[in-house]
Design a protein with these regions (language model features):
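Phosphate-binding loop of NTP-binding sites
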Residues: 93-246, 250-262, 326, 332, ...
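ATP-dependent carboxylate-amine ligase
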Residues: 1-19, 43-46, 52, 263, ...
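Short, well-ordered alpha-helix to beta-strand connector turns
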Residues: 31-32, 43-44, 67, 81-82, ...
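A short, gly/pro- and small-residue-rich
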Residues: 56-72, 84-93, 205-211, 226-230, ...
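Short, active-site-adjacent cap segments at secondary-structure transitions
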Residues: 77-78, 119, 151-153, 193-195, ...
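Short loop/edge segments at beta-strand edges and connector loops
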Residues: 72-73, 88, 147, 189, ...
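Acidic, Mg2+-coordinating active-site environments of NTP-dependent enzymes
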Residues: 78-80, 179-180, 206-367, 443-447, ...
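N-terminal leader/targeting and accessory segments in enzymes
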Residues: 1-96, 100, 313, 317, ...
């Protein structure tokens, strides 16, 4: 069903977002398309003017392609009169428009949102694996997913360009999920999506908060840790049940914020020494993981809850993945999924670019490709590798992105330097910042802890060198890009063969 232009104007007015408007008699115009991409065909379309780099040429192109009205924060003088609605905040306006245009498909979905500094993607796939096992058994379609790797909504299956899409894309994917017969969807919710209103208006059945650590702090992201943390916590304003990791740093504050939700479920392993209040004094998680063991690339652990006490196995290495699995089990528990489907789903799932392990038995060499790219993920990964490969030397290959998250250069340099026998610094989306500047920043911290390093800008060459120079009984960690297929160099997103392809080529 399509709605008239006046319907969208009224919704924006009700949200107190309208500054002024001039519709030139078009208030009864039926709107059939909604987009912010001027390249799209938009017959009878409503065009959104957004972004610091927006140009009036985009608006001209939009009307050439069929737009009948534009919405933006400022008036653009064209050579001819066109209807417009000016709003106070275009980011707040976009989800209002999208929700109406796509008729709020979230109401017809069991919607799970996941936030946290690390583990969002893996947890998303763990939840999907469990739900798919169960839904297949009762004749339902598989769960939709919106992740930093891909979007699968039952109609579209595409590689993701950002962790959480803009609101109009988000609502379109949910509409696709409903129209294709899906009943559930899991999605990653980034701090940027929360801060910039991309998920505004959504009501999550479950909001999962995995963990928190300093990240994404730069002029183009978050001003400071408080801004970052507050953005993450805001997910609780729009979820029915909060799902909380009691092992996380700042768990006391996370629990306090979770009171905004109607109910709370907790998970963890009892590692609560950093938590204040009743948790530190003995609160047991609702979903309690214990007896964690690693064996031949698999992680075994037990989970105790109000309904079961069972043994689980993860098909992926990485002891830190137990926390992600516990989050997925907690979500499944809320949906009353029988435990046998939880066990089956977690046992078989693997996630692209996450703890992908390649072994040369001839050289007794292991290479692990992982997306770890911030302090928390580096700490967890290096500690896990030491536990799983106690007699091996560690060599690491990584870099940091240009012009953002500057704290990573210090954090990753120090952590990798402390754990590695040698570090190879290479390009990881340098953008418009010089690689020599980025690698120089990181190298200072690697060197400060006495670790040798080498700077090799070409990532494929760096991976090759690390593998060729690694001694027997070594673990080479190739970190930061996971399964990403593009490298941002200058203003261009260049095709990149993936870290895994280079590893398989040179191992």
């Amino acid at each position: 069903m399509h709605y008239m232009l006046k319907t969208y104007l009224k919704l924006l007015q009700q949200a107190n977002l309208v500054k002024s408007c001039c519709l030139y008699g078009k208030k009864d115009q039926i709107i059939e398309n909604l987009t912010f991409d001027s390249r799209e065909t938009m017959k009878r379309g409503l065009f959104i003017c957004k972004g610091a780099a927006f140009k009036i040429d985009y608006l001209r192109q939009a009307f050439k392609n069929g737009a009948v009205c534009y919405i933006g924060e400022e008036h653009f003088p064209l050579d001819y009169e066109v209807p417009y609605i000016l709003v106070k905040d275009i980011r707040k306006a976009m989800p209002v428009l999208a929700k109406q245009f796509y008729e709020d498909p979230s109401r017809e979905l069991d919607l799970v949102g996941i936030t946290g500094t690390k583990g969002k993607t893996t947890t998303s796939y763990y939840i999907k694996a469990i739900m798919d096992e169960y839904q297949k058994s009762i004749g339902l379609r598989s769960m939709g997913i919106i992740s930093s790797i891909e979007v699968k909504d039952g109609v579209e299956h595409k590689t993701s360009s950002m962790t959480t899409p803009e609101s109009m894309e988000l609502y379109r994917h949910m509409k696709n999920a409903v129209s294709s017969g899906k009943h559930s969807m899991v999605m990653e919710v980034s701090s940027q999506a929360l801060k910039y209103q991309r998920v505004r208006g959504l009501n999550f059945d479950v909001g999962v908060f995995l963990n928190i650590s300093e990240d994404h702090i730069s002029p183009s992201e978050h001003d400071d840790f408080e801004d970052y943390f507050s953005a993450k916590l805001s997910i609780f304003r729009q979820c029915q049940t909060a799902c909380i990791n009691l092992d996380s740093d700042k768990a006391d504050r996370i629990l306090q914020a979770s009171r905004l939700a109607k109910s709370v479920i907790t998970f963890g392993t009892g590692q609560a020494d950093r938590i204040d209040g009743d948790v530190k004094n003995g609160r047991i998680p609702d979903i309690f993981g214990y007896d964690i063991q690693q064996e031949k690339g698999r992680i075994n652990f037990r989970v105790k809850s109000g309904r079961f006490d069972e043994r689980f196995t993860l098909g992926m290495p990485g002891v830190f993945n137990v926390e992600n699995a516990l989050a997925a089990i907690a979500v499944a528990y809320l949906y009353h999924i029988p435990v046998e489907y939880m066990i089956a789903g977690l046992k078989k799932v693997k996630v692209k670019g996450r703890m992908e392990q390649y072994v040369s038995h001839k050289r007794r060499l292991t290479v692990i490709v992982d997306y770890a790219h911030n302090r928390l993920s580096f700490e967890k990964l290096f500690q896990s590798v030491l536990m799983e490969h106690p007699f091996s030397k560690i060599v690491s290959v990584f870099g940091c992105p240009g012009n953002k998250a500057y704290n990573r250069r210090r954090d990753l340099g120090l952590i990798a330097g402390l754990y590695s026998k040698k570090v190879y610094l290479s390009a990881d989306d340098p953008g418009e910042e010089q690689f020599t500047h980025i690698s120089g920043d990181i190298a200072r911290y690697v060197e400060s802890v006495g670790c040798p390093y080498e700077c090799i800008e070409n990532r494929g060459d760096a991976i090759k060198r690390a593998i060729e120079e690694a001694e027997e009984e070594s673990v080479v960690l190739v970190l930061g890009k996971g399964c990403e297929t593009h490298q941002k160099i200058g203003k261009v997103s260049c095709a990149y063969p993936t870290d895994a392809n280079f590893v398989k080529k040179y191992l």
